Amino acid sequence: MTRSILSYTLRTFLLLFFCFAPLIGSTAEVFIEAESFQKRGGWKLDTQFIQQMGSPYLLAHGLGRPVDDAVTKFNIGESGNYRLWVRTKDWVARWNATASPGKFQIIIDGKPANATFGTNGVQWGWHDGGIIALEKGTNELRLKDLTGFDGRCDCIYLTTETDQPPPPADTVLSEWRREQLGLAANPENRGPYDLVVIGGGYAGMGSALSAARMGCRVALVQDRPVLGGNGSSEVRVWAKGNIRRGKFPRIGEIIEEISDNAKKSPGTYEEFGDELKERVIRDEPNIDLLLNHHAHRVDMDGNRITAVHALDTRTGSEVKIIGDYFADCTGHGWIGTWAKADLDMSPNGRMGMSNMWAWDELDTPTAFPETPWALDLQMADFPYPRDHHGQWFWESGFDKDAIGDAEGIRDWNLRAVYGAFNAMKNRDGAAKHPNAILTWVAFVGGPRESRRLMGDVVLTEDDIVAKKEFPDGCVPSTWSIDLHYPKEQYAKKYADNPFISKAVHGKGVDRSYGYPVPYRCFYSRNIDNLFMAGRCISVTHEALGTVRVMKTCGMMGEVVGKAASICAINDCQPRDVYESHLDELLTLLKLPGKAHRSTPSAEIIIPSDALPLAGPRGPANGMEISKLAGIVIDDELAKFTGNWTSGTGLPNYVRYSYKYTGPNTNATATFKFTVPKAGRYSIEAFSQAHPNRSTKTPVTVRHNDSISEYVINQRLKSKDDVVGITDLKLAEQDEVIVTIGTKGADGTIHVDAVRLLEIE
């Protein structure tokens, strides 16, 4: 920890030194990265498009209300006339939209520059701010937002060389930018680590936690200030995919520790638990967490990655992270791309990016600015945002460049949201929404599909539907094959780039047990030390429809982390885990999620607070038999004849569900007991009351050679939802058979569990 603090302090000192040091040479100049402002005010740090435009930038995301100024101080070494250059863009100019919504000013020592910024340029470039007279010494600079509609600023350059603009700065840490920042030619080294995980979403967190608990020294690199990816408070997609089930029901226990419990998507900030996720990661002594670090290239030795270079998105400094194994959990497959891993990307028809949003209603009327630059929408052009939120289907970019034009896709989504809210406030929806306000719009996009890195197995839709078995099948994928397409109803007005989607759910996935995704989808087939987890794993476009949801991605990470520990012990490649150490991996997958060891070769410790082992269908949602008195047999173990339907709608059922059927159908449910010791026992049925249940449900009890018939009332609410059938005096090893029938019933017959309870 001390080393990390000192390292960060040194980088900060160097950056401030180059801003405040006296200027030398024939040309005086000052370069200020917007992200390094001492006070950002209401401006957001946007790191999503560094690969496309070269840098993080500040974004005035105020939902139509100007944000507070960003403020910093800088030093001028000599008085004089300086030309002001600002790297920015007019973010709607590419669509020939009018009014330039992203306007802002530069104010130096209380005086605004002559130019208004955010009004020029389809692409990122230098906007000439004119000549400014500056005095030697400390000066104050402010970014003043004028609109609240996503003005953006990358950097500011002041120079006494007034004739030429600075060079382009589209590449990450270009030579010119390095020179201005005073960065050393060789970055600071971190590591070596057993595993370097790039990407702090569910896949990355699962990989890091799993590897660390199996004794690996891990670096977790995340380009945002929070963890969770699409499942963070910045994007607010609730985490889906059933966990703790299938062949290895211990997989998912780690993800359960960090999962949200959001009631909506998008939900509230608090529901997504950013602080919880960070705390769980930081509590692991084997993990070094690098938030606000954007990986931008790799070093290679043949087919092996030796290091990842990452940019500190707050200071512009760079670190080189050295490791033995690397896990690409970036979603877009960036690490694999730079390493020249085999990959695939559907040329069109991909799933898009969503920017969800929320609104509310106050007690008094509110105003919202007209948005002539947004999409030109009326209320019929979009689905009404019910329950005050715009959901996952606010999605676009299906046939657009999901990598090279990700910023354009995000911006199109913003134009759609603002255009829709403008319709609600200022057009044909105005009469019904006088008090409506925008409360939240995601400026961080939630992408679904781009590159997929190829492994030794490329999983297909046919594999999943046919339930093809692989010896290394492990991660249970329980989401349907869910692919998104433009929704025809709303696609006509903007046919080139529809902004509302529909989900088409395929069949064939067992959503209770899950399809076991093979381990060989989680490592590169041509980069020797590269794992992957998340939506960039080795699957086809169609198969991605089931594996891409976040809890499933997190479970991939759990498998990757354990495989990395086997690689560390045996000094082998990820492929060797399948070919030579598969039994070791499958053994580790049976460990509780909280099992841990200090090093990959140390003894494994299972703590007392480990979760109980779930069954193949996952943790029971109802009452656990182990917590009930007596001998309880659930309907899972009963013998049924006829047609029965499983249900979970009535509370207080035992384990997974109950079953029900209609009267007089000749259907039966039979429960067989062997008495463990002699005594008098009450025979009882667990039965959740409902007005449509039978009051005359027939029950037959067979004991030795005797057969007795009873009738129970399942409509009447009973204590603890248990209905008594009869009492019997029983000998040890007696057999008791209880059959619930339908003949003569006057309502729905309900079958849950049956119990023998010894009467003291």
Regions flagged by a language model, labelled:
Residues 27-188, 620-760:
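Extracytoplasmic
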Residues 299-319:
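Conserved beta-strand-loop-beta-strand element in the redox core of flavoprotein oxidoreductases
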Residues 182-189, 230, 307, 317-622:
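Flavin (FAD/FMN)-binding glycine-rich loop and adjacent Rossmann-like elements that form
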Residues 11-22:
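Bacterial N-terminal signal peptides
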Residues 189-201:
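Beta1/beta-strand and adjacent pyrophosphate-binding region of the FAD-binding site
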Residues 204:
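N-terminal Rossmann-fold NAD(P) dinucleotide-binding loop
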